[in-house]
């Protein structure tokens, strides 16, 4: 059986796959690069192998355009964006990157969640930013008045990352958080009350996005979060209005849709990949959720 699936790429794997083989590129610091990286788009994008195929990555990233246009996906949704717009992608989310126009300018940045693990920051601080969540809108367009301030922050981050800099992780943390807080002002967000149920629900969503091929029951995810299945279900229900099983089914359905549209796996292989050993069970599940069989869905645009 073929093992084709949407891969989770390490940073080195991503660079090998997405840059031209003739293009030699090395980060300024391999150690820092695993936690944080930033570069201007110009001078780099012409060496990338667009379109980039479906993949996941182990870090969060964003692209900020000051000119030009780009087309990038998050899950099954495709987004076209241009100047003064950020595109944010959380770690382990499925993505493709269709194009970056030749006149595109701006910044690419990635950062690992671990960079925010320190005693003076509250746990799960990234949960405050809807655009960095699995189900959030990845696009944030900023007003012209804020553009100069945001570019100054990005320039500070670029300077801290330069080969000659004796980098300071605290400086990098503060600047990233400053940028995220500024961007948050322009993000379309629902007002959500911070509570334990919300935090557990968000942790559950993040685990689903990362381990959907490995874990197939609510009980397994509850164990990973060190809570009982009943408590997990209550938290998810309170935070989202849906049961933990419903969110699990939604994630399985998303994976199935992506695999049907963007890989050459057979229906039987996809059924096996997402934990449905009986293909007829997968077909019934898929049709109950979409109104179409997997084969019918694959044929539609």
Give the role of each language-model region.
Residues 145-191, 199:
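An amphipathic alpha-helical interaction segment
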Residues 84, 232, 281-282, 286:
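Short hydrophobic/aromatic patch on the recognition helix
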Residues 158-165, 182-190, 204-217, 235-240, ...:
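Basic, amphipathic alpha-helical hairpins
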């Amino acid at each position: 059986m073929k093992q084709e699936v949407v891969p989770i790429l390490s940073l080195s794997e991503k660079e090998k796959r997405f840059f031209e083989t003739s293009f030699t590129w090395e980060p300024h610091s391999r150690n820092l690069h695993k936690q944080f990286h930033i570069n201007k788009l110009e001078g780099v994008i012409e060496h990338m192998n667009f379109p980039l195929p479906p993949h996941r990555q182990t870090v969060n990233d964003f692209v900020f355009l000051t000119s030009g246009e780009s087309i990038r996906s998050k899950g099954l949704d495709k987004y076209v964006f241009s100047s003064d717009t950020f595109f944010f992608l959380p770690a382990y989310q499925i993505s493709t990157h269709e194009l970056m126009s030749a006149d595109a300018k701006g910044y690419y940045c990635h950062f690992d969640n671990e960079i925010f693990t320190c005693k003076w920051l509250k746990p799960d601080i990234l949960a405050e930013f809807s655009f960095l969540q699995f189900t959030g809108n990845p696009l944030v367009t900023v007003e012209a008045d804020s553009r100069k301030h945001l570019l100054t922050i990005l320039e500070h981050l670029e300077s801290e990352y330069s080969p000659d800099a004796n980098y300071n992780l605290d400086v990098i943390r503060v600047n990233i958080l400053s940028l995220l807080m500024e961007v948050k002002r322009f993000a379309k967000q629902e007002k959500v009350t911070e509570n334990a149920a919300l935090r557990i629900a968000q942790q559950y969503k993040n685990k689903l996005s990362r381990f959907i091929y490995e874990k197939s029951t609510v009980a397994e995810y509850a164990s990973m979060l060190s809570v009982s299945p009943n408590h997990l279900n209550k938290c998810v229900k309170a935070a989202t209005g849906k049961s933990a099983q419903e969110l699990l089914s939604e994630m399985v359905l998303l994976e199935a849709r992506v695999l049907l549209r963007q890989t050459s796996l057979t229906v039987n292989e996809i059924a096996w990949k997402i934990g449905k050993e009986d293909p007829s069970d997968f077909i019934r599940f898929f049709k109950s959720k979409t109104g179409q069989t997997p084969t019918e869905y694959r044929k539609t645009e």
